[in-house]
Amino acid sequence: MSKSPKHFLDINELPLSELKSMLDASSAMKAKQKAHQPVRPLEGKTLAMIFERPSTRTRVSFDVAMRQLGGEPIMLTGAEMQLGRGETIADTARVLSRYVDAIMIRILNHDALLELAANATVPVINGLTRRSHPCQVMADLLTYQEHRGPIEGRTVAWTGDDNNVLASWAHAAERFKFQLNVATPPELAPKKAMRDWIKASGAPIMLGTDPEAAVRGADCVVTDTWVSMGDKEGEHRHNVLKPYQVNAKLMSLAKPDALFMHCLPAHRGEEVTDEVIDGPQSVVFDEAENRLHAQKGILAWCFDAVK
């Protein structure tokens, strides 16, 4: 009997030991790549990359990651796939499983991701959904670890609105046991399902509306663009979110050596000022690079190639 595939769908679905092994593998492979000693454990493997919408960072980072590991990526767009509109998602999963060795999908509908994973016989990786963005937060955790050491016991502050990146930060807080302080406008706060999960899981997460209270004494300050994928509200959201901008005054409330993170692309002058994103505490381009390295760790883990 063949064993079940190792899916990477959400951070809170995996044991801490597995998550740490991915980060350790990411660090090791990054060091090898920088030393011109590439590790190629995925020779002969093929990754299908499904994109419902155009993508830059996710597409390039997964493409390069798979190639650096010795494998071959194949890109499929939503227009080519007609995912769930012609052939069912379940049948698509079964067919692709006969052709490729793993599937990475970037799709808004999280339930479609779950259906794909339930029917695939090869590993499925969540490249992003409207509900969560675990690959990004694994890159963020790797970045924090590189600059400041283990994140356990530290304090991370999120200021802005509720979105998929915040959800994955919440999942990480529950697993890695760091304090997550969240500040959002009341109308853009985490929804009931997330609030219920926080309560049930006992995750060390504080939800509030005051950005200064959230950031005070933090080791890391995180924000994201105020208009997420698919959002059509514009001016109203910006007006509501103005008090949540990360600027020099807000950063001064965090610890002196606090890091600033943003998954990019950033709307400068909106959720963050130039002074902060270009300042000495900002690690946003390290985060962007670490999408590549973190995803190499995830891919290697999916194929049982983590040493």
UniProtKB/Swiss-Prot annotation:
The keyword Transferase applies. The lineage of its organism: Bacteria, Pseudomonadati, Pseudomonadota, Alphaproteobacteria, Hyphomicrobiales. GO terms for cellular component: cytoplasm. InterPro entries: Asp/Orn_carbamoyltranf_P-bd, Asp/Orn_carbamoylTrfase, Asp/Orn_carbamoylTrfase_sf, Asp_carbamoyltransf_Asp/Orn-bd, Orn/put_carbamltrans, OTCase_ArgI. Its EC number is 2.1.3.3. One of its GO terms (molecular function) is ornithine carbamoyltransferase activity. It is an enzyme of class 2 (transferase). Its main location: cytoplasm. It catalyses: carbamoyl phosphate + L-ornithine = L-citrulline + phosphate + H(+). Carbamoyl phosphate binds at S55, T56, R57, T58, Q82, R106, H133, P134, C135, Q136, C263, L264, R291. L-ornithine binds at N164, D224, S228, M229. Reversibly catalyzes the transfer of the carbamoyl group from carbamoyl phosphate (CP) to the N(epsilon) atom of ornithine (ORN) to produce L-citrulline. Keywords: Amino-acid biosynthesis, Arginine biosynthesis, Cytoplasm, Transferase. GO terms for biological process: arginine biosynthetic process via ornithine; citrulline biosynthetic process; L-arginine biosynthetic process. This is Ornithine carbamoyltransferase. It comes from Bradyrhizobium diazoefficiens (strain JCM 10833 / BCRC 13528 / IAM 13628 / NBRC 14792 / USDA 110). Belongs to the aspartate/ornithine carbamoyltransferase superfamily. OTCase family. It is found in: Cytoplasm. Coiled coil: none annotated. Pathway: Amino-acid biosynthesis; L-arginine biosynthesis; L-arginine from L-ornithine and carbamoyl phosphate: step 1/3.
